[in-house]
Every structure is written in C-alpha cells, then in structure tokens.
From Swiss-Prot:
It comes from Plasmodium yoelii yoelii. This is Glutathione S-transferase. GO terms for molecular function: glutathione transferase activity. It is an enzyme of class 2 (transferase). Pfam families: GST_C_3, GST_N. Its EC number is 2.5.1.18. Conjugation of reduced glutathione to a wide number of exogenous and endogenous hydrophobic electrophiles. May also function as a storage protein or ligandin for parasitotoxic ferriprotoporphyrin IX (hemin). Residues 7-91 form the GST N-terminal domain. Homodimer. In the absence of ligands two homodimers may interact to form a tetramer. InterPro entries: Glutathione-S-Trfase_C-like, Glutathione-S-Trfase_C_sf, Glutathione_S-Trfase, Glutathione_S-Trfase_N, GST_C, GST_superfamily, Thioredoxin-like_sf. Glutathione binds at Q62, V63, Q75, S76, D109, K121, T125. It catalyses: RX + glutathione = an S-substituted glutathione + a halide anion + H(+). One of its GO terms (biological process) is glutathione metabolic process. The lineage of its organism: Eukaryota, Sar, Alveolata, Apicomplexa, Aconoidasida.
C-alpha cells in the first residue's frame, strides 16, 4: 500500500472518530498541517490495517499512531500529551500542567463509561441518571473554581479540548444532558465557536463512531 505524504505529521486511524478525534481537534485548533490517513475509506478497514502492519513496526499493533520522520508514536493519550507540550497548550507552569492532566484523566474515565453504554449497550440507565450528571457536576465545579471560562489558568489547554470532545460525543446521543450545568454548557459553546474548531466540525466527515 502506498500513501501520499504531504506534511511532516502522518496520523493513522480508522475512518471514525474514537480515540483519534481529540488529536485531530488539537491539530485543527493549532492549525498544524498533517496527513490524515484513515483505514477503510475505500474498502476493508481491517484488511488495510493488516497490510499496513506488514510494512511498519507498530508498538502494540494498534492505532492511532503518529509518524514523524519515520519515528512512530503510539497510544492516543501519550500523543495528546506530546502535542500539547510541544505546542504549549499543556498549561503554564508545573501545577497547571498537573491540573490539565488531572482533568484529561477524568475525561478518560467518563468517556470510557459512555463508550460502554453507546457501543456495547451496557447500563445506559445508570450512565444517564447517575454517572453523566455526577461527572458533569465535577466539571461544572472545576470551571466555577477556576472562574476564567477555562479549566486551567486563563487560556485554553488540551484539557478544554478534551472536555469539548467528550461532550461533542455525548450530546450527539443525549442533546439535553447539560441543561442543569450552565457553566459547562457555556464552556462547550465557547470552544465550539473557536474559528478553527468551528471550521473543522463543520467540514468533518460523518462516521459511525
């Protein structure tokens, strides 16, 4: 299989959002050009991926992966942290970096619960009535405490993009889930109206997940 490489970053995932979407949002926000390679656009995704694995040595044999000058970086969360640090959206100072990472880790916890509900149909009632309002309350309080429209400091970090990506997913299934969380709802709207993010969302190809 031959790919046309146009930019310095080459990002590989399936034709879906999943664990790749936050990374794509980071690229969009930063206006960093990259080659977005998606298995399954023109055929069998898993056949394409299996052929790809024969050509390249991939840590853990899974995607997403980010290739930079022949160096392959794996694990979505590690890629998020790498890009955020590289492009200075990881928080100003050691403590803010910690808080951004703390919120990012929290997002992973609730996103995992949502995926179990959305993809595997597990405990939807419990998620909708207990887990989702509980975690939304956590994020609401963090915004209230920071009191700057952002989760960390007074400017955007990858924590803001991670929370946005989470609720971009959740609101597609539960559109009224933030009605009792005004600060969180306003924050999601704030991020969604950043010009680069707005343009990316408007032009994003639809996918099953």
């Amino acid at each position: 299989m031959t790919y046309l490489y146009n930019f310095f970053f080459f990002f590989f995932f399936f034709f879906s959002r999943g664990k790749a979407e936050l990374i794509r949002l980071i690229f969009a926000y930063l206006q960093v050009k990259y080659t977005d390679i998606r298995f399954g656009v023109n055929g069998d995704a898993f056949a394409e991926f299996n052929n790809f694995k024969k050509e390249k040595e991939i840590p853990f044999n899974q995607v997403p992966i980010l290739e930079i000058g022949g160096l392959i970086l794996a694990q979505s969360q590690a890629i998020v942290r790498y890009l955020s640090k590289k492009y200075n959206i990881s928080g100003n100072g050691e403590l803010n970096e910690f808080y951004a990472d703390m919120i990012f880790c929290g997002v992973q916890d609730i996103h995992y619960k949502f995926n179990n509900t959305n993809l595997f149909k597990q405990n939807e009632t419990t998620f909708l009535n207990e887990e989702l309002p509980k975690w939304s309350g956590y994020f609401e309080k963090l915004l209230q405490k920071n009191n700057t429209n952002y989760f960390v400091g007074d400017t955007i970090t990858y924590a803001d993009l991670a929370v946005f990506n989470l609720y971009d997913d959740i609101e597609s299934k539960y559109p009224n889930c933030l009605k009792n969380f005004p600060l969180l709802k306003a924050h999601i709207e704030l991020i969604s109206n950043i010009p680069n993010i707005k343009h990316y969302i408007a032009n994003r190809k639809e996918s099953v997940y």
